[in-house]
Amino acid sequence: MNASGDELAPDVRAILEAARERPGGETRVSVDARSFPEAVAETEAAGRVPVIAEVKPTSPTTEGVREDDPVELAREMVAGGATALSVLTEPEHFGGSAESLRRIREAVDVPVLRKDFIMNEAQLDVVQSDLVLLIARFVGEDLPALVEAARDRGFQPLVEVHTREELTAALAAGADIVGINNRDLGKLEVDLGTFEELAPEAPEDVLLVAESGVQTVDDARRMREAGADALLVGTAIMDGDVRQNTETLTQ
């Protein structure tokens, strides 16, 4: 299930190569995590759409760099109704950092997802967060061990998948929060139909997150109708007034 370099877009290949060389933390972390499932339930009880708003200064699929203080962006997203935040810690291609995540988590009271390309157990120890992203395509057979290692530290692992094979592997590894990525990392193309195709394959007790491609309220509604418990949204929130954009998608 590990992706070979030939299967990946050049930008993704470069990200993955850098991730393999990135050092881990010096000491094992222990996390007292804020519950993401509880946050989702509270948002739905309030009649709003659960959105994980992403603090993403830049990316290979966007133009330019947003120079705003990431903490201020995060606060505006929470003020706009974000259920949780996703914070990039990948430095070279997304402009993220572990320090930004630390500052953001101290400044807000919602769950925070660390979004990075984690390849080994030591990389879990770089920084505390409430959730941690594990990409099934990249970690392959190491997924069960990484899910267990993340939980042992107190993290809530969010396992990202794009295919039926990856979804099967995620469920076999015990994942109870699964992100279905509508973006094909081989071509960087987005198809909301990916979520619609895979979501029915997941058990009802698995919390499903629709990732990538949600640009409008209609997109959000489409993903919710297909079974998304929450939406992870980056560009559509970062492009413009982040508070207003978050409010629009969470209504």
UniProtKB/Swiss-Prot annotation:
**Assigned keywords, A-Z:** Amino-acid biosynthesis, Aromatic amino acid biosynthesis, Decarboxylase, Lyase, Tryptophan biosynthesis
* Record GO terms (molecular function): indole-3-glycerol-phosphate synthase activity; phosphoribosylanthranilate isomerase activity
> Lyase among the record's keywords?
yes
What's one GO BP annotation on this UniProt entry? L-tryptophan biosynthetic process
According to its UniProt record, in which pathway does this protein act? Amino-acid biosynthesis; L-tryptophan biosynthesis; L-tryptophan from chorismate: step 4/5
Question: Which domain of life does this protein belong to?
Answer: Archaea
Q: What Gene3D superfamilies does UniProt report for this protein, alphabetically?
A: Aldolase class I (3.20.20.70)
Would I find Lyase among this entry's keywords?
yes
Catalytic reactions on record: 1-(2-carboxyphenylamino)-1-deoxy-D-ribulose 5-phosphate + H(+) = (1S,2R)-1-C-(indol-3-yl)glycerol 3-phosphate + CO2 + H2O
Q: Which PANTHER family match?
A: INDOLE-3-GLYCEROL-PHOSPHATE SYNTHASE, TRYPTOPHAN BIOSYNTHESIS PROTEIN
Recorded family membership:
Belongs to the TrpC family.
UniProt protein name: Indole-3-glycerol phosphate synthase
Q: Which organism is it from?
A: Haloferax volcanii (strain ATCC 29605 / DSM 3757 / JCM 8879 / NBRC 14742 / NCIMB 2012 / VKM B-1768 / DS2)
Q: Which gene encodes it?
A: trpC
